């Protein structure tokens, strides 16, 4: 099989860099965080400029952590460090991301680019090395220099013989190497480099697709490095342990430990999921009562259904996840009333066990009436009315295009004419929203106490547009 060359390119502190450039500041020298200070100081920073990161502030710190760290820094400085807190502008970041994607298209076909996130791409550069008569490092620098000249934003890149090695070269090797004068870091590795340089690297969570849960289970078995996974995988007893502990993911874990990755760019482009879903999630700015949480779920469902209609899709199931606030178990009075199981949340804090449930609609549908009715019944069935809610997730499952949905025999219990009228109303609502904005037409539920629909309509991905 032909050896291939892959690039992974990550725009450096992308959101922060956009804010710096738009203010005429040097992204590498300015002190800036992207965070919505209007919420609370507990809000997570979406980005931190490299100059602030150099003081030990993490890229996903909470705003109060930034405030505390800067106070500590200023105690030992004659001139106080001053920084900018920039509110998120998601629409602007997406605009710049599209501009940068157009730069990639000047050199690379869309068939050989996989957009991994708003600030990160994978590129199969194999055929372009011959086309441009250059090596992978030269091509990578050409792309990054064009991005820098056009947008003022720099990048970090990894080059590898497969997608995994390109990603690891970028995430670990490049980010621990010295930058050039423009802050650019590029590293290149093959399988043997990977084993030599990274088999003993810690923490293991630095590696792509290894989260804290996986690392914890590995450490309980005495495994702390990728090299140890590779060596243990040669023994039948250990191989059995991996598959028993991680299921089908064990195969990928072992492959990655050896620096192997069978997936190619062509595989990514050919992939079509067997089933699909649409989902919406909200982390609430403060703990919500059950009654207020019910309003939020109603709003989320109605927006998801409009998304179905706009995309000409149908769903047949809804799944609801309710995550409760930690104060339900830390507040003495509330703790007395709660007798249910306690688990640890994402941050390791004690909280009531989340509620989870699903409802089938009995048909493929995009009816707001049918789906909202099922959602409210589900919420009432699984939500604990005495607990405060902090996070909600709603998922519409088994989504298919309307033209691929199997026909359904009409029955005496469904008002097909009413569903048709509702569909025309949905189409009208979408047309008004397209012309005049998402808040041009609202429902009564959007004005109830605790509702966030109007605010969410002005956001992209849960952040200010």
Q: How should each PLM-predicted stretch be described?
A:
Residues 1-118, 122, 255-257:
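Residues that scaffold, gate, or flank divalent-cation-dependent active/transport sites
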Residues 8, 206, 216-388, 407:
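DNA-contacting surface of Y-family translesion DNA polymerases
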Residues 18, 348-465:
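Acidic, metal-coordinating catalytic segment for phosphate/diphosphate chemistry
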Residues 117-124, 161-166, 232-233:
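Short, conserved phosphate-binding/catalytic loop or strand-edge motifs used
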Residues 143-202:
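Long, highly charged, low-complexity intrinsically disordered interaction regions
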Residues 161-164, 255-258, 314-326, 388-400, ...:
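A glycine-rich phosphate-binding loop feature that marks nucleotide/adenosyl-phosphate handling sites
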């Amino acid at each position: 099989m032909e050896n291939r060359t892959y690039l992974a390119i990550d725009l450096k502190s992308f959101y922060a860099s956009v804010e710096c450039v738009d203010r005429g500041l040097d992204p590498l020298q300015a002190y800036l965080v992207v965070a919505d200070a209007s919420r609370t100081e507990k809000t997570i920073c979406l980005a931190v400029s490299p100059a602030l990161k150099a003081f030990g502030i993490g890229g996903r710190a909470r705003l109060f952590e930034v405030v505390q760290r800067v106070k500590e820094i200023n105690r030992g400085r004659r001139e106080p460090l001053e920084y900018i807190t920039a509110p998120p502008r998601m629409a602007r970041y997406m605009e710049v991301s599209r501009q940068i994607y157009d730069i990639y298209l000047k050199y690379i076909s869309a068939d050989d680019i996989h957009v991994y996130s708003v600030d990160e791409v994978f590129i199969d550069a194999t055929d372009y090395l011959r086309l441009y008569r250059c090596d992978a490092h030269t091509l990578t620098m050409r792309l990054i220099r064009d991005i820098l000249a056009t947008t003022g934003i720099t990048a970090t890149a990894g080059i590898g013989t497969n997608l995994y090695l390109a990603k690891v070269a970028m995430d670990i090797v490049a980010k621990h190497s010295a930058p050039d004068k423009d802050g650019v870091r590029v590293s290149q590795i093959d399988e043997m480099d990977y084993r030599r340089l990274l088999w003993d690297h810690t923490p293991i969570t630095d590696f792509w697709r290894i989260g804290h849960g996986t690392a914890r289970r590995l450490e309980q078995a005495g495994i702390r490095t990728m090299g140890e996974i590779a060596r243990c995988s040669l023994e039948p007893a250990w191989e059995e342990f991996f598959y028993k502990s991680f299921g089908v993911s064990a195969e990928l874990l072992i492959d990655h430990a050896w620096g192997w990755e069978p997936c190619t760019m062509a595989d990514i482009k050919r992939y079509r999921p067997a089933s699909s879903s649409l989902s919406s999630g909200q982390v609430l700015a403060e703990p919500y009562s059950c009654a207020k949480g019910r309003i939020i779920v109603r709003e989320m469902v109605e927006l998801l259904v409009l998304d179905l209609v706009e995309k000409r899709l149908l769903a047949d199931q809804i799944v609801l996840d309710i995550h409760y606030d930690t104060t339900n178990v830390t507040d003495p009075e509330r703790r007395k009333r709660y007798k249910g199981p306690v688990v640890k949340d994402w941050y390791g804090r004690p909280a009531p066990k989340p509620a989870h449930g699903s409802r089938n609609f009995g048909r493929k549908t995009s009816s707001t009436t049918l789906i909202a009715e099922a959602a409210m019944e589900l919420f009432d069935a699984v939500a604990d009315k005495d607990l405060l809610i902090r996070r909600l997730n709603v998922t519409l499952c088994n989504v298919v295009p309307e033209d691929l949905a199997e026909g359904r025999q009409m029955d005496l219990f469904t008002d097909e004419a009413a569903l048709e009228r509702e569909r025309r109303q949905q189409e009208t609502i979408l047309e008004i929203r397209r012309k005049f904005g998402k808040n041009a037409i609202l429902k009564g539920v959007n004005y109830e106490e605790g509702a966030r629909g109007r605010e969410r309509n002005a956001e992209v991905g849960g952040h200010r547009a």
